[in-house]
Curated annotation (Swiss-Prot):
<keyword id="KW-0007">Acetylation</keyword>
<feature type="active site" description="Charge relay system">
    <location>
        <position position="297"/>
    </location>
</feature>
<dbReference type="Pfam" id="PF01764">
    <property type="entry name" value="Lipase_3"/>
</dbReference>
<dbReference type="InterPro" id="IPR033556">
    <property type="entry name" value="PLA"/>
</dbReference>
<dbReference type="GO" id="GO:0016042">
    <property type="term" value="P:lipid catabolic process"/>
</dbReference>
<keyword id="KW-0378">Hydrolase</keyword>
<protein>
    <recommendedName>
        <fullName>Phospholipase A1-IIdelta</fullName>
        <ecNumber>3.1.1.-</ecNumber>
    </recommendedName>
</protein>
<feature type="active site" description="Acyl-ester intermediate">
    <location>
        <position position="238"/>
    </location>
</feature>
<dbReference type="GO" id="GO:0005829">
    <property type="term" value="C:cytosol"/>
</dbReference>
<feature type="modified residue" description="N-acetylalanine">
    <location>
        <position position="2"/>
    </location>
</feature>
<dbReference type="GO" id="GO:0008970">
    <property type="term" value="F:phospholipase A1 activity"/>
</dbReference>
<keyword id="KW-0443">Lipid metabolism</keyword>
<dbReference type="GO" id="GO:0005737">
    <property type="term" value="C:cytoplasm"/>
</dbReference>
<comment type="similarity">
    <text>Belongs to the AB hydrolase superfamily. Lipase family.</text>
</comment>
<keyword id="KW-0963">Cytoplasm</keyword>
<comment type="function">
    <text>Acylhydrolase that catalyzes the hydrolysis of phosphatidylcholine (PC) at the sn-1 position. High activity toward PC, medium activity toward monogalactosyldiacylglycerol (MGDG) and low activity toward triacylglycerol (TAG). Confers sensitivity to UV-B radiation probably by deesterifying membrane phospholipids.</text>
</comment>
<dbReference type="InterPro" id="IPR002921">
    <property type="entry name" value="Fungal_lipase-type"/>
</dbReference>
């Protein structure tokens, strides 16, 4: 295996990943996989059983989070904040899950991801402090995209800081039929912006919008680590990828100084905004976006050019058909599957190169939430499940749904 010396600035896109995507630099491969594993952790920890009073929360607490999701080198990273999003502003049902229990932990909000930093020991070894933000995609399958409005709307809320009332800038009463009459100017998809900027005064967890939570914590962390050469990496898959792109731009525009690198490494990202928004993103020299996309993934082409949307950032196009371990699936959900993409990244040697795993990564991970592996791999489909579907036997001999590891607590 050829060894290269690539600076951390280059890995974060200081040169737009020129010359290190093809052939794929080994350190960049490892960074992409790490970000993908951070994304996967948001799925693995999310309680999606609507019978549970904790549906929509994180199953694991911050202190043991990375251990419980079995992250490689878990001790190198610490979760410092959980993030929450709400559906207050005309968000279609199905994107944020609600518990059917009358004792639900919160009826207006869902856990939406986390902020993590490198540990003191890891930071000392690196000579700098890394800040990671992982935003959760939807736990629903492919059909979620059909219920989310694709209309573009003004990106003006992102051009200045959040409102004093805790909202991110989109006013109450905004609907998915809303559209700006002005066809010019910087625009993003209303659905993506709504999730990012909504707050709900009746919720203890989203009195501040996802946007306001993020900017407040990033400001605090940048001050705390100002002498440790901090960098910010955002990551997300699918819906989470769109929010990571918006948040990366927002942090570069409103939440950090020009000398702090802000990088989004996203997977299977639908289109976010128009050409003018892309120009705004590119105007920030410290802001870089790398989009890992499967060439046959249909969702990365949504909402589409007819509505004025364009690709944003540098595309790193891979092809799941190159892996000899994956079946010839006709399921678009498989083409969009995060673990399948990470599997291909692990063995990617260019469009013309032969697939060969370049890091130690179990192929069984592909089938965590799907059945994309060939039958001869002998790996059951959708194997990441709670024992007994989360039921435990209590002291009275009753089988009941287990509580989460730590009771959710508002953090802002």
């Amino acid at each position: 295996m050829a060894t290269t010396t690539t600076s951390w600035e280059e890995l974060l896109g200081s040169k737009n990943w020129d010359t290190i995507l093809d052939p794929l630099d080994q350190s960049l491969r490892e960074l992409i996989l790490r970000c993908g594993d951070f994304c996967q952790a948001t799925y693995d920890a999310f309680v999606n059983d609507q019978n549970s009073k904790y549906c929509g929360a994180s199953r694991y607490g911050k202190s043991s989070f990375f251990d419980k999701v079995m992250l490689e080198n878990a001790s190198d990273y610490e979760v410092v904040n959980f993030l929450y999003a709400t559906a207050r502003v005309s968000l279609p049902e199905g994107l944020l899950l609600q518990s059917q229990s009358r004792d639900s932990w919160d009826r207006e909000s869902n856990w939406f991801g986390y902020i993590a930093v490198t540990s003191d020991e890891r930071s000392k070894a690196l000579g700098r402090r890394e800040i990671y933000i992982a935003l959760r995609g939807t736990s629903r399958n492919y059909e979620w995209v059909n219920v989310l409005g694709a209309r573009p709307t003004s990106a003006d809320p992102l051009l200045h800081g959040p409102e004093q009332d805790g909202s991110g800038g989109v006013v109450e009463g905004t609907t998915f039929d809303s559209d700006s009459e002005d066809e010019e100017g910087c625009k993003v998809m209303l659905g993506w912006l709504t999730i990012y900027t909504s707050n709900h005064p009746e919720s203890k967890f989203t009195k501040l919008s996802l946007r306001s939570q993020l900017l407040a914590k990033i400001k605090e962390l940048l001050l705390k680590y100002k002498d440790e050469k901090p960098s910010i990496v955002l990551t997300g898959h699918s819906l989470g990828a769109t929010e990571a792109v918006l948040a990366a731009y927002d942090i570069a525009e409103n939440g950090s100084s020009d000398d702090v690198p802000v990088t989004a490494i996203v997977f299977g990202c639908p289109q976010v905004g128009n050409k003018e928004f892309r120009d705004e993103v590119m105007s920030h020299k410290n802001l870089k976006i790398l989009h890992v996309r499967n060439t046959i993934d249909l969702l990365t082409r949504y909402p589409g050019g007819l509505l004025g949307y364009v690709d944003i950032g540098i595309n790193f196009v891979i092809d799941t058909k190159k892996s000899p371990f994956l079946s010839d699936s006709r399921n678009p959900g498989d083409w969009h599957n995060l673990q399948a993409m990470l599997h291909v990244v692990a063995g990617w040697n260019g469009k013309k190169g032969e697939f060969k795993l370049m890091v130690k990564r179990s192929i069984a991970l592909v089938n965590k939430s799907c059945e994309f592996l060939k039958a001869e791999c002998l790996v059951p489909g959708s194997w990441w499940v709670e024992k007994n579907k989360g039921l435990i036997k209590n002291e009275d001999g009753e089988w009941v749904l287990a509580p989460v590891e730590e009771e959710p607590v508002p953090e802002f």
